[in-house]
């Protein structure tokens, strides 16, 4: 298995971001990312997917070998779409659409029709910022997802950077503070979103969780002050999605795109907050009688299942079954649990950073049936 770091859900000048695709690629290379997925609002930008090198231009990338792994001289830029009904007020029900080669914004007025369109086109889709509260001091509306009766979407964006930001800026003074000290913002997904995820999993559905930066690199003006707040390279070092591939990236765009979206659709990934410390190397696996599984997989409970989690450095590890804690390991590198009952098992990991306990890793479930 091979781990890559993906940052997804970001915006360029084609919608409400401030940068170009080349700007974003440069920031991603600087941050050490492997892949970025751009998702402008209601527009599918064509012709810009590819491997970008430090010069900022797409170019063929050589096959990756052991000697080139870990280098940050190139990044794969893929393009998706964030689709929502622009005639709706407020504009709720945003959907992240990946691996679709045509604009689906004409379907935005009905979320289920949109999801069906994604599936018919061979794509995958995720509910964006499920809980996204208002921020009256900045005239920002609540744009949470409301159409929870929909079916057949791939998953949800468990941790969205700006959604969390909106909870800590009741005044413009708070906003000014966090504009200069963004490292103090991140604590974890919205509690309502975590609970919603567990509730959805309890229905028997497989719901994949992603982490999204929702990066815009916004320009802030307050009197004489001007600042680019939350620049792309900051976002790219914070909330990421680490994806587990069956083989390394090859350098061929079509091949690698298939690998990445295949792994995301299966839930072979985890949500990571890489700002306190790199989460590379986290694993959550299971072994049963003649079977094994990684995050997103299903295996039989008969005969017992051993669940194992490993983290890159000592941290607090929580094991949850059907949304309830069944194991807690403090200041530990690893956790092992023998599961004798069916259930949806997932792991949360917490780390101390800047004097506070913060969410670090949220693994996708292993389904023991």
Please describe what each predicted stretch is.
Residues 17, 182, 186-189, 253-256:
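Residue-level preference for long, well-ordered alpha-helices that form the structural scaffold
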Residues 31, 36, 51-52, 179, ...:
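Short amphipathic alpha-helical patches
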Residues 2-153, 157-171, 187-199, 203, ...:
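A metal-dependent hydrolase metal-coordination microenvironment
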């Amino acid at each position: 298995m091979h781990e890559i770091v993906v940052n997804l859900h970001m915006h360029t000048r084609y919608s409400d971001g401030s940068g170009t695709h080349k700007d974003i690629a440069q920031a991603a290379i600087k941050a050490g990312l492997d892949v970025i997925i751009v998702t402008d609002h209601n527009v599918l930008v064509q012709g810009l997917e590819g491997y970008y090198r430090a010069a900022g231009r797409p170019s063929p990338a050589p096959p990756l070998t052991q000697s080139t792994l870990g280098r940050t001289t190139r990044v794969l830029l893929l393009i998706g779409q964030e689709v929502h009904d622009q005639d709706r007020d407020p504009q709720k029900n945003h959907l992240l659409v990946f691996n679709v080669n045509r604009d689906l914004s004409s379907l935005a007025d009905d979320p289920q029709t949109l999801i069906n369109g994604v599936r018919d086109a061979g794509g995958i889709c995720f509910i964006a910022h499920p809980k996204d509260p208002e921020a009256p001091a900045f005239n920002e509306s609540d744009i949470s997802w409301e159409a929870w009766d929909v079916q057949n979407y791939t998953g949800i964006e468990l941790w969205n950077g700006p959604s969390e930001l909106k909870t800590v800026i009741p005044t413009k003074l708070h906003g000014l503070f966090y504009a200069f000290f963004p490292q103090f913002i991140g604590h974890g997904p919205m509690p309502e979103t975590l609970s919603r995820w567990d509730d959805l999993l309890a229905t028997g559905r497989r719901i994949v969780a992603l982490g999204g930066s929702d990066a815009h690199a916004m320009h802030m003006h307050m009197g004489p002050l001007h600042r680019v707040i939350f620049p792309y390279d900051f976002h790219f070092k914070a909330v990421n999605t680490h994806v587990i591939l069956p083989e390394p990236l090859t350098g061929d765009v079509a091949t690698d795109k298939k690998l990445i979206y295949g792994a995301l659709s299966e839930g072979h990934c985890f949500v990571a907050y890489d700002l306190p410390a790199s989460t590379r190397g986290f694993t959550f696996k299971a072994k049963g009688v003649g079977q094994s599984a990684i995050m997103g997989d299903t295996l039989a409970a008969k005969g017992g299942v051993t669940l194992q989690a490993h983290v890159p450095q000592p941290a607090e590890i929580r094991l949850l079954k059907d949304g309830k804690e069944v194991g807690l390991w403090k200041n530990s590198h690893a956790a092992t649990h023998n599961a004798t009952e069916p259930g949806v098992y997932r792991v949360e990991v917490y780390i101390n950073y800047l004097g506070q306990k913060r969410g670090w890793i949220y693994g996708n479930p292993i389904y023991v049936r």
